[in-house]
């Protein structure tokens, strides 16, 4: 298998982008990635697009061909990948496998979602849950994650203040991100006093409905040198996917994500590193509780310890001795445009590891040269993890 690298990244702003169309978002992100990589459309061999539900959100299926057309890339192969909120990272995984196998040298991989063009976004999002045993009985993702939070509080003594500090830190980080949906700070009191959604979750514990797109250029490592300087090449050391039950009630435990633990252990082994070697992480904090759980599944701390670590702000950008978590602001504050999220996460790590000027106001200290992303579909039915490094 060949070594695989990222040589360019681009994204749109995330938010309620009423004036933008689905197709214009992904084309903007793709053009930015192509320009950043210093390549031309004719250099691209294939394209993958992560998208959860364009059919429900904008009434458009067959989007892979549509996007290739509007990007001026026909007749290259173009494939859509769907795995709920993990669609973007699974699209990237397919691109990585494609390049590693020798099938292609340069692949454009993007993610996009336009969520504000539908009246009932909640119903569309709920299509990623078990329709017979969850959605049919009125369960929504806020209610499912609320059950996870309640049980976690019961088992480990997590306080609402500890949980809420997650949101405070995410908004602090997002205030330094010009692409973030919520680029402003919030106080602990504001989080605690925000509107109840599903006990114990408040509004400011939840990620928003978002429009947005992101794109990466994935390239064979030797060929990458033809396009960019060596400092702009970041290597993909691991790309791992794992699955679990879609329905939350079918799990052995609702305070852990087994697929995340399995995938992270395999990814660390593939990259030949340990959790302590990670400088920076982007985790799937669709709800604050998931951020805490994923810290534990990634091996950053023991079970039940994440709340205190977060409350002590050890995950902050400027804290020394613990991986910085979600310098972008995470899903919570940077935004969660479903199919684009997995790509955006990897794009942030790419920028961080090469210390790009785009992240100068939120730059993490890079000591070991490793970053990790974890992207989750549903309540953990699909998990995809990528480890990136500035070392080949």
Curated annotation (Swiss-Prot):
It holds the Pfam family Thiolase_N. GO terms for biological process: isoprenoid biosynthetic process. Its EC number is 2.3.1.9. Keywords: Acyltransferase, Isoprene biosynthesis, Transferase. The active site is at 85 (acyl-thioester intermediate), 336 (proton acceptor). InterPro entries: Thiolase, Thiolase-like, Thiolase_C_2, Thiolase_N. NCBIfam families: PRK06064.1 (NF004720). This is Acetyl-CoA acetyltransferase. It comes from Methanocaldococcus jannaschii (strain ATCC 43067 / DSM 2661 / JAL-1 / JCM 10045 / NBRC 100440).
